[in-house]
């Protein structure tokens, strides 16, 4: 009986742990904040193609993913990734806000039907603090989400 109870408790704990969203990470599709431009481009070339390069150290990449159509990548003056934005496909499976991070810890704003969830993630274990922002017109599904260095201005 003790063995059966232990197995049941282990099963319940594993279900609860797998249902909880993971701690947000400072990356999207393998493109991490502070990554060098060369490393970011190598990863991006493996998952998509460059569509536009801006003089302001910004790039737009079309990616081969069922849920994300494009990645926007911005670099700082040292050509290290300062932000990454993922644009959700309109013709693919939708991404729920809660898949990105725990909604209970987000700051939420709704302005003229536009939903915005913001998480401020503290730095720890050698990782810098960063901000995660998810936006969309639908109250459940996002249109885009971004990770950016905590010291950066708002991403439009």
Enumerate the language-model features and the residues they cover.
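N-terminal, post-signal-peptide region of Sec/Tat-exported proteins
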Residues: 44-80
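Bacterial N-terminal signal peptides
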Residues: 7-15
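Non-cytosolic coordination micro-motifs
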Residues: 20-58, 86-156
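Aromatic-patch recognition
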Residues: 79-82, 87
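Positively charged n-region of N-terminal signal peptides that target proteins for export
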Residues: 1-4
């Amino acid at each position: 009986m003790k063995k059966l109870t232990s197995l049941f408790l282990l099963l319940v704990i594993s279900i609860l742990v797998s249902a909880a969203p993971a701690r947000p990470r400072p990356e999207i599709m393998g493109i991490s904040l502070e990554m060098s431009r060369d490393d970011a481009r190598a990863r991006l070339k493996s998952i998509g193609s460059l569509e536009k390069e801006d003089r302001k150290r910004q790039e737009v990449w079309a990616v081969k993913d069922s849920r994300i159509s494009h990645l926007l990548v911005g670099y700082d003056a040292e050509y290290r990734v300062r932000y990454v934005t993922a644009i959700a496909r309109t013709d693919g499976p939708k991404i729920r806000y809660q898949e990105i991070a725990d909604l209970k810890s987000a700051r939420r704003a709704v302005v003229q039907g536009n939903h915005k969830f913001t998480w401020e993630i503290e730095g720890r274990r050698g990782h810098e603090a960063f901000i995660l922002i998810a936006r969309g017109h639908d109250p459940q599904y996002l249109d885009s989400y971004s990770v950016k260095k905590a010291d950066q201005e708002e991403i439009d």
